[in-house]
Amino acid sequence: MAKEELIEFGGVVSEALPDNRYRVTLENGVEIWAYASGKMQKHRIRILAGDRVTLEMSPYDLTKGRINFRHKS
């Protein structure tokens, strides 16, 4: 899939789950499942509940996403 096809959203992490997965509430109120991107895992960037994040979602499955940026608090 080309990167141009990804949809970017902002949201807040509501819960940290096992296996580097998170439950994120988007700005429009929808709750989805998300995981940290490979670079975030490689550099061991910690994501906690309450963090503001930017994530990418495929237009084909709007229930899952990939967190690609954690905003500074």
UniProtKB/Swiss-Prot annotation:
Its main location: cytoplasm. It holds the Pfam family eIF-1a. Keywords: Cytoplasm, Initiation factor, Protein biosynthesis, RNA-binding, rRNA-binding. One of its GO terms (cellular component) is cytosol. It is found in: Cytoplasm. InterPro entries: NA-bd_OB-fold, RNA-binding_domain_S1_IF1, TIF_IF1. Residues 1-72 form the S1-like domain. GO terms for molecular function: ribosome binding; rRNA binding; translation initiation factor activity. Belongs to the IF-1 family. One of the essential components for the initiation of protein synthesis. Stabilizes the binding of IF-2 and IF-3 on the 30S subunit to which N-formylmethionyl-tRNA(fMet) subsequently binds. Helps modulate mRNA selection, yielding the 30S pre-initiation complex (PIC). Upon addition of the 50S ribosomal subunit IF-1, IF-2 and IF-3 are released leaving the mature 70S translation initiation complex. Component of the 30S ribosomal translation pre-initiation complex which assembles on the 30S ribosome in the order IF-2 and IF-3, IF-1 and N-formylmethionyl-tRNA(fMet); mRNA recruitment can occur at any time during PIC assembly. PANTHER family: TRANSLATION INITIATION FACTOR IF-1, CHLOROPLASTIC. This is Translation initiation factor IF-1 1. The gene is infA1.
